Amino acid sequence: MRLPIFLDTDPGIDDAVAIAAAIFAPELDLQLMTTVAGNVSVEKTTRNALQLLHFWNAEIPLAQGAAVPLVRAPRDAASVHGESGMAGYDFVEHNRKPLGIPAFLAIRDALMRAPEPVTLVAIGPLTNIALLLLQCPECKPYIRRLVIMGGSAGRGNCTPNAEFNIAADPEAAACVFRSGIEIVMCGLDVTNQAILTPDYLATLPELNRTGKMLHALFSHYRSGSMQSGLRMHDLCAIAWLVRPDLFTLKPCFVAVETQGEFTSGTTVVDIDGCLGKPANVQVALDLNVKGFQQWVAEVLALVP
């Protein structure tokens, strides 16, 4: 039986690969997509997501979400993904539009209609998920679990300790981590290992039309290089859903720092139980890299 999922995303070049896997992995049933400001503005992430859905002729409803964080000024990652978020490929024009309601309400409505609890996957800042929990707390029993790409048990990638998706809206992340829902965190500890090799990247143009498109996008992606390999951060959240055996997880207490002058956005991961608090997150700490790379190749070969 395919696993029903809703995907909250901020495309973003590595998001494009994650979206492809979410649509075409035979184990998954992607039923709803929502966008959030993150890598670029929410107008751009929505445009990019609609372009990808049209490219793959995927009839999946999409709702536009939060344009700004809960309480602070927005930040982006255009330096990594380019000003448009997905530069490098000329997508054809289309007439697709997002749903007429905000993302958190679209998630609420879809959860309430679902015959069983649904897995949420968030690969951008957690603003939409926090809004859902704050505005629609009655939805919590309908969430099977939340799988996120975000956070780190060690070093960060936008401050010394903070990972971008959490640092972009620390208050939202803190709300989500305190919520009591089941959370799996695929942070930098594993995503920095999730590298597609130069040899594999070179084969993409001959793979299929998606391979050609991704290869063009990757030439503008700044999380690694075509010569040294590219990190597929967001894809790890999808990979865990399909191949949890590739990941080493540990239950930990995790809090999000929202006040520190130098540490705001840090995920404080209590690996050794020093704080004596009950675990609230399953934290991915290690990855079977070769197994991950093999799975990626298998999935992308299924994409038209």
Curated annotation (Swiss-Prot):
The active site is at residue 233. It is an enzyme of class 3 (hydrolase). Keywords: Glycosidase, Hydrolase. Pfam families: IU_nuc_hydro (PF01156). One of its GO terms (molecular function) is uridine nucleosidase activity. It comes from Shigella flexneri. Hydrolyzes both purine and pyrimidine ribonucleosides with a broad-substrate specificity. GO terms for cellular component: cytosol. HAMAP family: Nucleosid_hydro_RihC. PANTHER family: INOSINE-URIDINE PREFERRING NUCLEOSIDE HYDROLASE, NON-SPECIFIC RIBONUCLEOSIDE HYDROLASE RIHC. One of its GO terms (biological process) is pyrimidine nucleobase metabolic process. InterPro entries: I/U_nuclsd_hydro_CS, Inosine/uridine_hydrolase_dom, IUNH, Nucleosid_hydro_RihC_nonspecif, Ribo_hydro-like. Belongs to the IUNH family. RihC subfamily. Its EC number is 3.2.-.-. CDD domains: nuc_hydro_IU_UC_XIUA (cd02651). This is Non-specific ribonucleoside hydrolase RihC. It comes from the Bacteria.
